Swiss-Prot record:
This is Uncharacterized RNA pseudouridine synthase RF_0863. It catalyses: a uridine in RNA = a pseudouridine in RNA. Coiled coil: none annotated. It is an enzyme of class 5 (isomerase).
């Protein structure tokens, strides 16, 4: 037996928190009966519907690498009616994202049909490497010569693993930034703190997975044998 919200999340419908909201809103049925308690326990023999859609409890975990373009937000529904990642994806089953990229960021976004798999990737204790290429306007010397480890900005501590300059011209500089635990808008806030304006941010790696030659909007599925490792 497992909690109903967990089963919904594991099926790739949404996060566990969003699943709890759907239950409280009366959008979930078990064996034809509307359930209003997120604490309800179910098993594989129960038939579960979410917003009229029957979910598959026995599906195998799958993983995709997706090149998120600029201009999409990483959510299933946006109260401001902005375009979302999931509205643009075609040919995929119901999936959730592993982590997020903000509206103006692009690059590697991992997608999965398994809530459990998503949580394994997102656990801070697993310390999965995230690599970003960042283009910024301003004087790079201040950032590169500063101690940016354990940096406190507006009461939040940031601890990037490394920030290295790899290309520079008259107007912009390119940096490679490595994180092992990403916080909301972390890179943009660190750069802004040191007087640099980020005008392009691309995630090129998450864990052992890289963006390779994918074009914006394209995706590819990871082989199950690689996933099992």
């Amino acid at each position: 037996m497992q909690r109903l919200a967990k089963i919904i999340s594991n099926a790739g419908i949404c996060s566990r928190r969003d699943a709890e909201k759907l239950i409280l809103e009366g959008q979930v049925k078990v064996d034809g009966i509307t359930i209003l308690s997120p604490a309800t326990n179910v098993d594989i023999s129960n038939q579960i519907e979410v917003s009229g859609i029957l979910i598959n409890q026995s599906q195998k975990p799958r993983l995709w690498i997706y090149y998120k373009p600029v201009g999409l937000i990483t959510t299933h529904k946006d109260p401001l009616s902005r375009k979302t990642v999931f509205e643009q994806l075609t040919g995929l089953p119901r999936v959730i994202s592993i982590g997020r990229l903000d509206l103006n960021s692009e690059g590697l976004l991992l997608l999965t049909n398994s809530g459990d798999l998503a949580r394994q990737f997102e656990l801070p204790s697993n310390r999965l490497k995230r690599v970003y290429h960042v283009r910024a306007y301003g004087k790079s010397d201040i950032l590169l010569k500063s101690d940016y480890k354990n940096l406190e900005i507006d009461g939040i501590f940031y601890n990037p693993h490394s920030i290295k300059l790899f290309k520079q011209n008259k107007s912009n500089s390119w940096f490679e930034v490595v994180l092992f635990e990403g916080k909301n808008r972390e890179i943009r806030r660190i750069f802004e703190y040191f007087g640099l304006k980020v005008n392009k941010l691309i995630r090129i790696q998450y864990g052992s997975f890289t963006i390779d030659n994918l074009k914006p909007g394209a995706y590819k599925e990871i082989n199950n044998k690689i996933l099992e490792k």
